[in-house]
Amino acid sequence: MRILRWLAWSVGVLFLIGTALQLVEYFNLWATPPPLAPLNMVEQRLAVQDYRIAIWPIFALNNFAFALGFIAVAGLGLALAARLGSGDSQRIVLLTSLGIAGVLGAVGQFMVIGAAQVTIDLAYCDCGFKNEEIVSQIWGQMLIEGAATWLINAASVLAAIGIVGADIAFRRRMPAAWDIVSWLTAIGLIATVVVGFINVEGELGFWLQVLVAGILVPVWAIWLGASLRANPEPGAEAGTAVA
């Protein structure tokens, strides 16, 4: 029971930290990027390289927090499933959806960190093919980040399924308002994937992610951990009923 609570709280806190670090980067609270200029791809990368190096700690910690958060999601799925009977249909839903979501999400976030770190450690070798190196580096990073985005999208969809499954399984043990938060969180996770897939212009995708990852997911997870803490184990309830 204690492990379940800590996993739930870890999910909430880690996603909150990751979102807070995203906002630090967005509002230029750690470092300020240079003004945009009509430069080609190589010139643009060289112009922002100092900024990329300066913001790297925030970028890395941001994605690392989300990676750990996804790992906690996988653990939470296992812990929630363990509280259900072997014949409960939601047991397999929680095991597969939240478990796989945690793995895919963590792998995706670590891929983003690894792809960016290479470009931070060495922008180019200055061996006579600087332009070619930088262009190939940018495209390589884009390919890796594209694959990582799809892993995270899949994780978001599976997490939404898992959240609905948790709501169905534990609805009677949780406050009624948590049921609403569960559905809002699941819908929000699906919406972030849809908005990203259809390439909506503007900042809708960013702020939707902030809402979901920085507010809805933390509220859902922390509330779950706090409420289950106040409830007895299912075994204890069954024992009392038999007695």
What are these regions (language model features)?
Residues 1-243:
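Hydrophobic, aromatic-enriched alpha-helical segments typical of multi-pass transmembrane helices
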